[in-house]
């Protein structure tokens, strides 16, 4: 599962960070773009963007399928109204301090400048950014939290080891942004897994992640 999803992404991101570190240009003078233009042909670019988002939804869907098939006890998968409230709270807890941490890290030379969107300045691209935001949230939380934690517990891993594995995996595939992105996402991983362990609810995590990315991606596209 991890080989075809975020495990490989983590290795690739670590190598990207190594490449950026070896570059003579200081890390905080480099820029990395999250949502890049995928084609120079205007009408083809949205097609590529939708395919990329679809792949992420497929990753999350595979994790969901495996959970439904192999869970020893059924999990409550219903989406409740309070999930949106909890998700918004998680987004605020992670997003606001995370933004301050990012700017501090850039100032200290521990992060590249991150451009959340490199798509064309076109209002028609905004729905694609929203789609990708929620695709990220769905894939990451289903795979890195729900599936991975459940599978490791089935393999009799203790909770400290599960926390380490899940949070380090989340940090690894964000390393292409800089060292601070790895650390910040490890912290996010610990908080998100703690919530999942405490409540058994995954949708607030998906919602929180989707809201964070939507604000970052769409906000950047609108203001910059």
Regions found by a protein language model. Give the residues of each.
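Hydrophobic core of alpha-helical transmembrane segments in multi-pass integral membrane proteins
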Residues: 2-12, 53-67, 91-104
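Small-residue packing motifs within transmembrane alpha-helices
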Residues: 3, 56-59, 83-87, 91, ...
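Generic alpha-helical structural signal
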Residues: 5, 9-12, 16, 133-134, ...
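Short helix-terminus and kink motifs of transmembrane alpha helices
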Residues: 8-20, 145-146, 150
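Juxtamembrane helix-loop-helix connectors linking adjacent transmembrane helices
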Residues: 19-50, 68-136, 150, 154-155
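Structural signal for the C-terminal ends of transmembrane alpha-helices
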Residues: 64-74, 195-198
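Transmembrane helix-loop-helix hairpins at the membrane interface
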Residues: 99, 103-224
């Amino acid at each position: 599962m991890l080989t075809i999803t975020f495990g490989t992404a983590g290795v690739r991101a670590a190598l990207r960070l190594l490449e950026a570190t070896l570059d003579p240009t200081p890390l905080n003078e480099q820029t990395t773009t999250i949502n890049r233009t995928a084609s120079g042909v205007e009408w083809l670019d949205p097609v590529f963007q939708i395919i990329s988002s679809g792949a992420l939804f497929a990753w999350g869907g595979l994790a969901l399928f495996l959970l439904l098939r192999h869970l020893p006890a059924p999990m409550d998968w219903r989406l409740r109204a309070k999930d949106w409230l909890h998700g918004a709270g998680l987004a605020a807890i992670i997003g606001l301090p995370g933004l301050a941490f990012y700017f501090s890290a850039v100032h200290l030379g521990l992060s590249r400048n991150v451009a959340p969107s490199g798509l064309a300045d076109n209002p028609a691209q905004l729905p694609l950014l929203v789609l990708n935001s929620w695709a990220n949230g769905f894939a990451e939380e289903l795979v890195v939290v729900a599936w991975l934690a459940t599978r490791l517990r089935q393999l009799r891993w203790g909770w400290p080891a599960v926390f380490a594995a899940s949070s380090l995996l989340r940090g690894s595939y964000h390393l292409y942004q800089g060292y601070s992105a790895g650390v910040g996402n490890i912290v996010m991983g610990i908080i998100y897994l703690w919530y999942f362990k405490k409540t058994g609810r995954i949708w607030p995590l998906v919602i929180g992640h989707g809201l964070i990315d939507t604000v970052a991606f769409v906000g950047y596209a609108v203001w910059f």
